Amino acid sequence: MLRAKLVDDPQIKYASLHNPLPTQLHAYVWPFLIIWPAFFAVYLSPERYDTYIQGQEWTFVWSGSIITAQSLLWLMTKWNINIQTLFTATKARSLDSAQLIKVIPVANAGSAEICPLHCDTMGGKKTFSFLFQKRRFLYYPERQCFAPLSYVLDAEPKPPVKVFQQAQGLTSKEEIDRIQHHYGDNTFDIPVPTFMELFKEHAVAPFFVFQVFCVGLWMLDEYWYYSLFTLFMLVVFESTVVWQRQRTLNEFRGMNIKPYDVWVYRQKKWQELTSDKLLPGDLMSVNRTKEDSGVACDILLIEGSAIVNEAMLSGESTPLLKESIQLRPGDDLIDPDGLDKNAFVHGGTKVLQITHHNSNGEDGSEKARKLSSGVPLPPDNGAVGVVVKTGFETSQGSLVRTMIYSTERVSANNVEALLFILFLLIFAIAAAWYVWQEGVAKDRKRSKLLLDCVLIVTSVVPPELPMELSLAVNTSLAALSKFAIFCTEPFRIPFAGRVDVACFDKTGTLTGEDLVVDGIAGLTLGHEGADVGKDGAHTELAKSANVPLDTTLVLASAHALVKLDEGEVVGDPMEKATLQWLGWTLGRNDTLMSKAAALAGPRTVESVQIKRRFQFSSALKRQSTIATVVTADRKTSKKTKATFVGVKGAPETIRTMLVNTPPHYEETFKYFTRNGARVLALAYKYLSEESELSQGRINGYIREEIEADLIFAGFLVLQCPLKEDAIKAVRMLNESSHRVVMITGDNPLTAVHVARKVEIVDRDVLILDAPEDDMSGTRLVWRSIDDKFNRDVDPTQDLDPEIIETKDICITGYALAKFKGQKAFSTLLRHTWVYARVSPKQKEDILVGLKDAGYTTLMCGDGTNDVGALKQAHVGVALLNGSPEDLAKIAEHYRTTKMKEIYEKQVSMMQRFNQPPPPVPVQIAHLYPPGPRNPHYQKAMEREAQRKGAATLATAGNQTEHIPTITSPGAQALQQSNANLTPQQQRQQQASIAAAGFADKLTSSMLEQELDDSEPPTIKLGDASVAAPFTSKLANVIAIPNILRQGRCTLVATIQMYKILALNCLISAYSLSVIYLDGIKFGDGQVTISGMLMSVCFLSISRAKSVEGLSKERPQPNIFNVYIIGSVLGQFAIHIATLIYLSNYVYSIEPRKSDIDLEGEFEPSLLNSAIYLLQLIQQISTFSINYQGRPFRESIRENKAMYWGLVAASGVAFSCATEFIPELNEKMRLVPFSTEFKVTLTVLMIIDYAGCWIIENVLKNLFSDFRPKDIAVRRPDQLQREMERKKQEELETQAEKERQRKV
């Protein structure tokens, strides 16, 4: 027996094995091989025909029913994967006999598929595999399941470091062939289907088929114009969706890194290969490429270091230093997410620079540099790395896969939609039953009766629903892109409207990256006569000029900054700020020099050269370096070389490494953290004071030896200014029924200080943490910020209710670990405001805990340390470090590139028709050489010079050689065409110059179409972060309220669509039954006018923009509540009552006909005209009354298209009811009305509208549930302060207006 879990992968929910059936045995074929011959046997025999079919119309009914049934069975196989396997395949008994595998992924991870199974016997071993969503799954007999291809790094436990350090690459042809067969090429092959292939896929979607079926029924009922108009709208909409998908797939295809040449060590020698032939296990040279391409796969560096830009992956543009594992202890296990995180160069990142350390040689000579495995160095002098993952399994590959498969199609909440349709179906079946009963009683034609019943039932399923949902989500995507926010998983946008808890990282999210160094504290610890605070803290801060030599050396050496060949220093902004404050500069080869003439003390520092780094790790909370320090005696100028160790890290961590902890150590660093500063402890020791240790000796040390027996060198105190919009953004969230929480790896005292500044906490805070003096690791205490309150806590017991009610809570990662799994854990999560000193894994646990408690969560982080938490949240937002200026440059570059593409297309098109190329558009004239075809060249060069701040160009001719011209075929054609012109060609040229204005306009209009901002943007690499479904390119915290506004806007749009569609469906069910049996018909023109009105209104609804602020009121989370269902039924009752009253009133004037001809042509009558106008006003009221505007979206008056559309339609309705414009009544085929009738009809229309308005507003005020969840409820004192603040702001605004008026 096969295991229940056939495929072991978190993205796959279920899988089963199958064998295909022959086509003739498919469920939509074999029954009809019997049915069709039987039908024709009856049809072709006159006797049987008269007995069983009895007439032409029943022939049509029977044949139509069989065709519909067969089509439906076939279509069901396209709609549901389970039905497809049931109808077209049988279950396989074993893996050996199976040919197919059905794979169903988890929700929102793409579509289910039936994949062919492949069986290979390479190397004499039988292997089974299948390809699903571009991933190869292999069968592992020992685990009895399929799993994605496993790589060395996927093994548990992880392999030792020496496996990679001693890697020899792929050594034999057999091994290369085997691995090539197993893993395939290193490519992202994204096939782009043709327009017709994609359209076929869309054309069999349930709603599209249903709509076409309805159109067919309307045609049978002879509503030709209306049917053709609807069909045209459907095809156009589906075509635009298909075109959009095709464009997106083409963009994804462009993400593939073009193959380029790389040096690879295979079969014991270095050889050049193209990057698409790289295989896992290859040894390759990592270097900056000629093409400046991204790295082609995921690589683990085993020699050398690289400076890389990961903007294409994480979106972060700050270059990072990646260092090899060459000096890591060989027996340690590789730690890809921790210690060795900085040794991995991921696919898609760009290498900016490579450096080598003289690894093994005592003499430090270049010749001595070699790998521990004995492999010679690459010919291009690059760093050496082991290929660990290729193709779609790389970081970039998985990002592209997420983009492709999570965005396939946005769907409604399927369970809710299904229940909603079933609810409407009750009314439709009742109406259809009424029509059938009445029709049978009057002996009506059965075929027409059946058609009417089917029309009634189908009218209940709102076919616009998926279209409307797509429109609403796409509108939100387009709106977010204007704020530089991109989304890879659009189905998450409605979640943003339901968010209860918003969690923020601190550093780089609420606080800025541009840190300010305040000074060095703690230098006087243990000295007499120092400034001491009440609690013993040494509050004095030393400036850079007064910092002792050893402290200076720690600051100058303990960092990961690197200087690029171009001269730019790259790395952590905090470390840049520190070095700048110190007055030191970083040169080549990790050498640092002091700008200052001299430092205090008997010796001056000549230079510091970093020899080895132990990079910062969030798990270890420290970093260290070994450096050679050259000092000179002030008197004798004698130079001395020493080997120095500099360490910096969290004060609590460094404390355990000191030989002697000075008195008041803790009080001093806590004094600064309480005041919101970021504090790092500094420590050092000398490995040798009089001589320089060789590189070999330095490389022999392990991290634990280096980071022990240290001497304290002070506290580095930095201020992290809040981002400009942090307070405003958090206040908006607090005041709009959200709970805001901070989750940070920083010190709890600093975290609480920042939380108070941004108004996350506003009461006294208690910190749940280990006691300071406890080394046992078992105790927990509540302690206040000033340490005056201390109380022991037992994690196995419930929390003290008094503390929860009266204090704000901060908890550390240590305490969180103690509470995890205990019964009080959920209570703790519910009441905690600040989480400090938590690891990335704990951030994830917090989000999972909040989700399990039933809250909708948002996490906002920086996209590098918060990946797990960002993925776990319902709405994960990565804030990148871009500025508006950066975005303006990117947008300008994008426009120029697009313009160039369009112009190149025009040039090649003209060439095809043997016409001269069009003039170069003014926007890109500076990219082409001067000449008659480039009339705007001079102007463009002046514009570019001004833009770059240069002097205006004197002449274009002098600058020609400096211009970056393009050498595309179009540009070459342009250059060639200007030479050796004949008189006739000159005349053509003059004509083309005359056409320059037209060409410019044409290109501009094409560009505008390309950049149509109402379209949802196509995500490109660099827009999205691997970490999160939402990415803000700007570092502004206000991105969060913007996302929540769009989420609420989409949620409100979805719910109001349900209401409007429900009312329309219920009214049409009544119209098609009771009204229809009374002989009331509408003209084709009348139906088309009302259909167009609905289309315009639906389009306008989905395009309504969100309002600026966030309201305290929350949108309805779902449609099944007393308010929404009550409102729909109440409005429906009003509509029915007015329709019944009007028809009875008309019968009192014109008696009812005894013989109603239901099949007759449409003829205007008093009843037809009156009912049409009443129904028109009912449609208008449905849209206008159920439109949800403020406080979530712009009001109906602000939604201009909808407002004027409804005003125009109301004008038409009332104008016709009052016969204000008689000609209009004639055009619309309405009969004349008497004065009394006009008054009655107009009053009834007003009553209908007013009644619905009253019902909607009464139920909204009585039953709508706008309350936030318990976690987001504000206390009375907070609400009071909020009111007072708003009053004060209003007074200040009025005073300012008054002042300006007087001025």
Curated annotation (Swiss-Prot):
GO terms for biological process: extraction of mislocalized protein from ER membrane; intracellular calcium ion homeostasis; intracellular manganese ion homeostasis; protein hexamerization; protein unfolding; response to unfolded protein; sterol homeostasis; transmembrane transport. Keywords: ATP-binding, Endoplasmic reticulum, Glycoprotein, Hydrolase, Magnesium, Membrane, Metal-binding, Nucleotide-binding, Translocase, Transmembrane, Transmembrane helix, Unfolded protein response, Virulence. Its EC number is 7.4.2.-. The ATPase activity is stimulated by phosphatidylinositol 4-phosphate (PI4P). The chain crosses the membrane at residues 25-45, 57-77, 201-221, 223-243, 415-435, 1060-1080, 1082-1102, 1122-1142, 1201-1221, 1239-1259. Belongs to the cation transport ATPase (P-type) (TC 3.A.3) family. Type V subfamily. This is Endoplasmic reticulum transmembrane helix translocase spfA. It comes from Aspergillus fumigatus (strain ATCC MYA-4609 / CBS 101355 / FGSC A1100 / Af293) (Neosartorya fumigata).
